[in-house]
Amino acid sequence: MPKITLPDGTKKVFEKAVTTLDIAKSIGAGLAKATIAGKVNNVLFDATLPIKNDSKVVIITSRDKEGIEIIRHSFAHLIGHAVKQIYPNIKMAIGPVIEDGFYYDIFSEYRFTPEDLIKIEERINQLIRKDYDVEVLQVSKQEAIKTFKERDEIFKLRIIEEIDEKDSINLYKHEEYIDMCRGPHVPNTRHLRHFKLLKLSGSYWRGDSKNESLQRIYGTAWSKEKDLTNYLKRIEEAEKRDHRKLGKKHSLFHIQEESPGMIFWHPNGWIIYQILEKYIREILRKNEYLEIKTPQAVDKSLWEKSGHWEKFRDDMFTTASENRTYAIKPMNCPCHIQVFNQGLKSYKDLPLRLAEFGSCHRNEPSGALHGLMRVRNFTQDDAHIFCTEEQIQEEVSTFIDLVFEVYNTFGFDEIIIKLSTRPEKRVGSEDIWDKSEEALTEALNNKNLKWELQPGEGAFYGPKIEFSLKDCLNRIWQCGTIQVDFSMPVRLDATFVDINNEKKSPVMLHRAILGSFERFIGILIEQYEAKFPIWLAPTQIILLSITERNIKKCIEFNNLLNTKGYRSKIDIRNEKIGYKIRESTLARIPLIGIVGDKEQELNSVTLRALDGSNLGIYELDNLFKLMNTLIEKKGRVD
């Protein structure tokens, strides 16, 4: 007689083993109809599996986050059901849930096309309209092997081989189709309505290029039609803003096969990069950072001593010369400690803030590379603060102000903050962990900031705070971080002389604001849709001549603007002015200055903004003042 305790404290006693669906029916028909699964003693559980013991039960519906994930996982199995009906000889690999959707990896000699995707989607629609029950079978390992041997599902058999003999395996029956999964899944396909298959891509079994090549079908699914519609609109908008497309269209950068994951910056893109670097350099100078430059290639002995060789060897690019092995640096921290170690340091020298625009290389898998967002060569706005335990809170507090100043400058006003605390495996005393976590917590609380705790998610060498941006499409980008490190200064013999004339190891704070220039520029391209604010725009103003009579004046104005330090261009082609305006607008130039007979006579320009609004006639001195005002505002939105 299991006693079931519901979230509101209500207790229900049943004569025999009971399912989540039975519990829902005992409450009401409407709830039973909406039930997708249960959470039994905090573990997700299929709605039709029996609960035999006293348990705390939460009924999961499509309104719950877990409910949406279960819907998506069930749709992945529907891909298998549909594809096996259309192409019986294909082999199913894995079909997990991912953010906002799901995918299924499939082995097939036949190459799927976009037309096949439409056909598969139509078949899924036919299947879900049948409202059939999804049956869950709990079987032994041997029974599972027998089931998938009969179906010649070689990838399922490989997965089963890794499962312990004692563990039971969940099989899910969609009519004639059988799949396996930890579950849970929906009890009936009536819960599966709002979905879309999105795209095809290639993959490898277990993500290893030495294994079989697979085809991946991506999809998304939601509990409501309006949520699906909104998501598809967001995808469409994201594709429009894709930094790879805009980078090519506006000649900002490119990547080519001969140098995967490494950026060829074009003049327009390099201007943005240099402006960003100049801005961060000014911020660092105002905050008393000392800029340094350290080598690209460093003998492996330093990486062995720092611990990176053991942990990150496979992610490093290496080279050899004169019987020595060098690693191209994947991060800057060990080199910054070498600079700190030059000369005796006193407590009076702390905090010491060393900054570098450090070019790093990491051998990321080729399949993970993605435009500017995931590269193999990147530049960090990296700095390391050497300080005492007592100085941690003040340094963290100052850095938080710095992060908000920079992000607000670019128009980002929603910043998500997460504090990660001590993991199970860690170095350092409990006392220093206590002090560090308290310092980070106090720094956040003293600023009345909203933040999220991530217990156990800190690095083995110290706690950290992560800062993420929310962009115009509500996507989250983790950029900034400040991380306490008790370990590396000790490993690399960094010391200072304290007030008692004793040698001590400093605490090192790893910190970055942008994360990497490449990724941050990628975020900016998509955030602004390449309509950069005037301070960042590769071309700030373009002057258009109306007739040949105005060409000389156009050139004169352009020379004056460039002499003053503005980034100005001219279009003096023998084309209609409307055509020139359209071309300049498509090029995303913030200001368009028109020079005709009237403007020539008044020694002025008629100014248009990128959005098409007419700003009026400006004499050059007033134009300079306007541009200065706009440039000073940077990316802020008034």
UniProtKB/Swiss-Prot annotation:
Can you list the GO cellular component terms from the UniProt entry?
cytosol
Ranges where the TGS domain occurs: 1-61
The record's EC number reads 6.1.1.3
- Cofactor binding, per record: Binds 1 zinc ion per subunit.
Gene3D superfamilies associated with the record: 3.10.20.30, 3.30.54.20, Anticodon-binding domain (3.40.50.800), Bira Bifunctional Protein, Domain 2 (3.30.930.10), Threonyl-trna Synthetase, Chain A, domain 2 (3.30.980.10)
Name the positions where Zn(2+) binds. Answer: C333, H384, H510
Q: What is its main location?
A: cytoplasm
Question: Which Gene Ontology terms cover its molecular function?
Answer: ATP binding; metal ion binding; threonine-tRNA ligase activity; tRNA binding
Q: What does this protein do?
A: Catalyzes the attachment of threonine to tRNA(Thr) in a two-step reaction: L-threonine is first activated by ATP to form Thr-AMP and then transferred to the acceptor end of tRNA(Thr). Also edits incorrectly charged L-seryl-tRNA(Thr).
Q: How does it assemble?
A: Homodimer.
* UniProt KW keywords: Aminoacyl-tRNA synthetase, ATP-binding, Cytoplasm, Ligase, Metal-binding, Nucleotide-binding, Protein biosynthesis, RNA-binding, tRNA-binding, Zinc
**Which reactions fall under this protein's catalytic activity?**
tRNA(Thr) + L-threonine + ATP = L-threonyl-tRNA(Thr) + AMP + diphosphate + H(+)
NCBIfam families given for it? thrS (TIGR00418)
GO BP annotations, alphabetical order: threonyl-tRNA aminoacylation
Q: Name one Pfam family in it.
A: TGS
Q: What is this protein called?
A: Threonine--tRNA ligase
Q: What class of enzyme is it?
A: ligase
What family is it from? Answer: Belongs to the class-II aminoacyl-tRNA synthetase family.
Which cofactor is essential here?
A: Zn(2+)
Q: Where in the cell?
A: Cytoplasm
